[in-house]
UniProtKB/Swiss-Prot annotation:
Catalytic activity: (2R,3S)-3-isopropylmalate = (2S)-2-isopropylmalate
Protein's recorded name: 3-isopropylmalate dehydratase small subunit
UniProt function note: Catalyzes the isomerization between 2-isopropylmalate and 3-isopropylmalate, via the formation of 2-isopropylmaleate.
InterPro entries: Aconitase/3IPM_dehydase_swvl, AconitaseA/IPMdHydase_ssu_swvl, IPMI_Swivel, LeuD, LeuD_type2/HacB/DmdB
GO biological process, one term: L-leucine biosynthetic process
Top-level class of the enzyme under EC nomenclature: lyase
Subunit structure: Heterodimer of LeuC and LeuD.
Source organism of this protein record: Aliarcobacter butzleri (strain RM4018)
GO terms of molecular function: 3-isopropylmalate dehydratase activity
Documented EC number(s): 4.2.1.33
Keywords: Amino-acid biosynthesis, Branched-chain amino acid biosynthesis, Leucine biosynthesis, Lyase
Family from the record: Belongs to the LeuD family. LeuD type 2 subfamily.
Pathway: Amino-acid biosynthesis; L-leucine biosynthesis; L-leucine from 3-methyl-2-oxobutanoate: step 2/4
Length: 166
């Protein structure tokens, strides 16, 4: 999981958790159910256009609003490989890592346009726009958070740690 490559979908600033997954769908916590409606309020056709491995590149404060783990669950289940933005709401930031959804803070994220392909290299701390050939350095992810991503989230991480202890 050292490199993530995918097609970019752009969304603006202040995309809140109600836009990521609308409250009307929260009667279920089934990831596959939630995936069918991800980002529907921003683009009703988005769930149909999305392909596994695609990457969301958004404006600042992505994931603001209500504290709900349904938002990163829906994104991950829909096949979103990563989210890149200049900043994230702190509770979304933590929920994303807890659910195993990779997110990256990149101040220049708005330079990356929809439809372009990017590669995110965790080892080098770089995002390369394969379309324009421009490379950006992203704000490093702390080692523990990298472990959460590598194991698929906090629950899987805890299970692995418990197995080690036995």
């Amino acid at each position: 999981m050292n490199t993530i490559t995918g097609k970019v979908w752009n969304f603006g600033a202040n995309i809140d958790t109600d836009v990521i997954i609308a409250a009307r769908y929260l009667n279920s916590s089934d990831p596959e159910h939630l995936a069918k409606y991800v980002m529907e309020d921003a683009d009703p056709e988005f769930p149909k256009k999305l392909k596994k491995g695609d990457i969301i590149v958004a404006g600042e404060n992505f994931g603001c609003g209500s504290s709900r783990e349904h938002a990163p669950i829906a994104l991950k289940a829909a096949g979103i490989a990563a989210v890149v933005a200049p900043s994230f709401a702190r509770i979304f930031y933590r929920n994303a890592f807890n659910m195993g959804l990779p997110i990256f803070e990149l101040p220049e994220s708005l330079e990356i346009k929809e439809g372009e392909e990017i590669s995110i290299n965790l080892d080098k701390g770089e995002i390369t726009n394969n379309t324009t050939k421009k490379t950006y350095k992203f704000i490093p992810i702390p080692p523990f958070m990298q472990e959460l991503i590598a194991t698929g989230g906090l629950i899987n991480y805890a299970k692995a740690e418990m197995k080690k202890a036995i």
